Amino acid sequence: MWKMNDVVSVRYERDYIFYVVFDNGLAGEIDFSEYPGRGPVFSPLKDPDYFRKAFIEGGTIAWPNGADIAPERLYEKLLTLTMMWSSKNGQ
């Protein structure tokens, strides 16, 4: 059975980018710039100060208004980026 990995650390980097760490050690920068335009629950994220208020809740990244992003989506996104980087750099 597949184990869902939880976000254990989130740190704001710049613009719409957070450095995210999962419970299995997978870590890296994720660009969240696509989310502020994805409907009313995410529209407050257009405000940079509000965007930086992200916190961890239930193993994923969430914001005070109840917006959150499925941890498996974040994991898949980061894993894909990591695999692309490794392939590009011969690792």
Regions found by a protein language model. Give the residues of each.
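Motif-centric detector for short Cys/His coordination patterns
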Residues: M1-Q91
